[in-house]
């Protein structure tokens, strides 16, 4: 009798743990039916809803996100983004935040995947390793001493007075009023 009680005590939390860890959502159907899903063609990016049945619109960088709201568009962050939650709740008592890029070295939904690239830099959405060809191009095109012609070397020699005078003339033509640039 004791062994049956012990076995039951051990198996019930295991079964409940698997059910709770699978997903947290309210009013999910027992079986998914794609005909019940709304169209997500107008969305820039999509994610699975909390039930794991339908594609819904995803929130983008800088947009508001919520902990969990079943079947609603634009409340979960898209791939390569993570919801950074605020300490307060909204008027309905729901936790909310803002979508931000995954930190370097992570990627995927909620930034749960780890980048295994040699450089440690990967695409935040797909996890594909990124290489920067401009560094390789610059190293391959390093100047050599024999590439400059005699006229280029002659033009580069001198005391530099002509260059200073030319820069001084350009600065004199500028107005002294500070110009404000629009932010990007």
Swiss-Prot record:
The keyword Nucleus does not apply. Keywords: Angiogenesis, Disulfide bond, Glycoprotein, Proteoglycan, Secreted, Signal. Residues 151-172 have a biased composition (Basic and acidic residues). Pineal gland specific. Gene3D superfamilies: 4.10.40.20. Its main location: secreted. One of its GO terms (molecular function) is integrin binding. Disulfide bonds join 28-51, 32-53, 37-54, 43-57, 65-83, 77-99. It comes from the Eukaryota. It is found in: Secreted. Residues 24-102 form the IGFBP N-terminal domain. The keyword Zinc does not apply. InterPro entries: ESM1, Growth_fac_rcpt_cys_sf, IGFBP-like. One of its GO terms (biological process) is angiogenesis. O-glycosylated; contains chondroitin sulfate and dermatan sulfate. Glycans are attached at residue 157. One of its GO terms (cellular component) is extracellular region. Residues 1-21 form the signal peptide. Residues 145-184 are annotated as: Disordered. It holds the Pfam family IGFBP. Involved in angiogenesis; promotes angiogenic sprouting. May have potent implications in lung endothelial cell-leukocyte interactions. This is Endothelial cell-specific molecule 1. It comes from Rattus norvegicus (Rat).
């Amino acid at each position: 009798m004791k062994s049956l009680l012990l076995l039951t005590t051990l198996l019930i939390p295991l079964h409940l743990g698997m059910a709770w860890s699978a997903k947290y959502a309210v009013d999910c159907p027992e079986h998914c039916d794609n005909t019940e899903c709304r169209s997500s063609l107008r969305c820039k990016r999509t994610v699975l809803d909390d039930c794991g049945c339908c594609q819904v619109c995803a929130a983008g960088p800088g947009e508001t996100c919520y902990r969990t709201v079943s079947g609603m568009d634009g409340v979960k962050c898209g791939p390569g983004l993570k919801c950074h939650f605020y300490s307060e709740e909204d008027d309905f008592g729901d936790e909310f935040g803002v979508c931000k890029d995954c930190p370097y070295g992570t990627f995927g939904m909620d930034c749960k995947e780890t980048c295994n690239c040699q450089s440690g830099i990967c695409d935040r959405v797909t996890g594909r390793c990124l290489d920067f060809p401009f560094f390789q191009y610059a190293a391959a095109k390093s100047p050599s001493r024999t590439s400059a012609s005699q006229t280029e070397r002659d033009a580069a020699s001198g005391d530099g007075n002509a260059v200073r005078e030319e820069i001084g003339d350009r600065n004199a033509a500028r107005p002294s009023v500070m110009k404000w640039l629009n932010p990007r």
